[in-house]
Amino acid sequence: MKLWGGRFEKSTDALVEDFHSSISFDQRLYKQDIQGSIAHARMLGEIGVLTSAEAQQIIEGLKGILTDIREGKIQFEIGAEDIHMNVEKLLTERVGTVGKKVHTGRSRNDQVALDLRLFLREEIDHTQELLIALLRTVLDLAKEHQETYMPGYTHLQKAQPISFAHHMMAYAQMFLRDLGRLKDTRQRLNVSPLGSGALAGTTFPLEREMVAQELGFDGITWNSLDGVSDRDFALEFLSAASILMMHLSRLCEELVLWSTGEFQFVIMDDGYSTGSSIMPQKKNPDVAELVRGKTGRVYGDLVALLTVMKGLPLAYNKDMQEDKEQVFDAVDTIQKSLLVVEPMLRTMKVNKKAMAEGAKGGFTNATDLADYLAKKNVPFREAHEIVGKLVLYCSKRGCGLEDLTLKEFQEHSDVFAEDLFESIGIEYCVRQRHIPGGPSPESVAQAILWTEHILEQFTGG
């Protein structure tokens, strides 16, 4: 007999039972579901809906179920549909008729909204811990390589010289914003919907704030329809997760490129590489490639839930059963990705020589030469044209700007003087860009300190 079967004259079709059931995946919410039921039962006892003895009997029964699930002693039933009904059925079997009172003043609609918020709050905290560990590794790399010079790119073409530290600090800023998005999401989801009922609250004088406080929420939802019908908190998490995965994917894309024989900027540790079944020489950056590939999976989770929610009238609809698998998948994917990217970064070797050689080619110092002329009162557009012609001149001769003689420079502009050679040295080019946020060692050191300060605010020390 279904716990809701009073108005039905026959049982649900077996095909519908299987199609309708969500226990195969929402059993993952067992801890949150039982936590919520314990807090609800305790509150029912406090307000006199249950006697103290009944409340305690229910609470002890729920604690026993929680222990047995953790120890693998429970076999969930598809016929009981979902985690809520499975737990309530188990409770009634253990404590008798009093177990049927646990659902007083409550609907599965507010129950599942509570469970999902509790789950996401916990997983966001864990995700932040993993992201902070990655961010610290990025900062360590930046500290170590403030004078490791490399080419910066636009359009994947060499553009201007920077330091590897500066490049890493770009990702540090991205990951810092990712932390902020996760923090903001957690703050907005941390309100309790319990007490919203199916959609219109309840006639029982529930102490919603009491339950919210016991479960660690900052407050309660203030509209019962909204409390059960929206999943914007889950969508916000999936959005933050998608952006985080995008940042991880971009980093991994660069590691894949940099580890090629054409770049040789980094050497991936054997522990984070794989071989080929046919080509003995291969060392493939499969971990980085997989993170890049899994990013699309998280995007799909976001789009799937957006699509589920877009046409739903208020309040709860069965479509919303489809919210959990997307959330679970995204949580697992981002956490596993963070777990492998951090040690992959930490163990890779940076080829300083290859980076420095790369910085010297491709006329990365051309902008600095144009700036040299502009500082001598040549209008920048004229300076740009002069240097462009010098680049063409060098390209035809197979040499760099630094290989030209002063006479060759002066054939293009009499403003050039002996001091130009200092201004186009790669190290000088980087060091002169000491504007806040720039690539000079001083600017990067300042950025590292600022980032560490912000990170301390996240970690509380």
From Swiss-Prot:
State the Gene Ontology BP annotations.
arginine biosynthetic process via ornithine; L-arginine biosynthetic process
Q: Which family does it belong to?
A: Belongs to the lyase 1 family. Argininosuccinate lyase subfamily.
Q: Which CDD domains match?
A: Argininosuccinate_lyase (cd01359)
Recite the UniProt keywords alphabetically: Amino-acid biosynthesis, Arginine biosynthesis, Cytoplasm, Lyase
| Highest taxon of source | Bacteria
Query: Pathway involvement?
Result: Amino-acid biosynthesis; L-arginine biosynthesis; L-arginine from L-ornithine and carbamoyl phosphate: step 3/3
Keyword Kinase in annotation: no
What reaction is this protein's catalytic activity? 2-(N(omega)-L-arginino)succinate = fumarate + L-arginine
Keyword Cytoplasm (UniProt): yes
- The record lists the organism as Desulfitobacterium hafniense (strain Y51)
PROSITE patterns noted in UniProt: FUMARATE_LYASES
**UniProt EC number:** 4.3.2.1
Q: Provide the Gene Ontology terms for cellular component.
A: cytosol
- This protein is called what? Argininosuccinate lyase
Record-level Gene Ontology MF annotations: argininosuccinate lyase activity
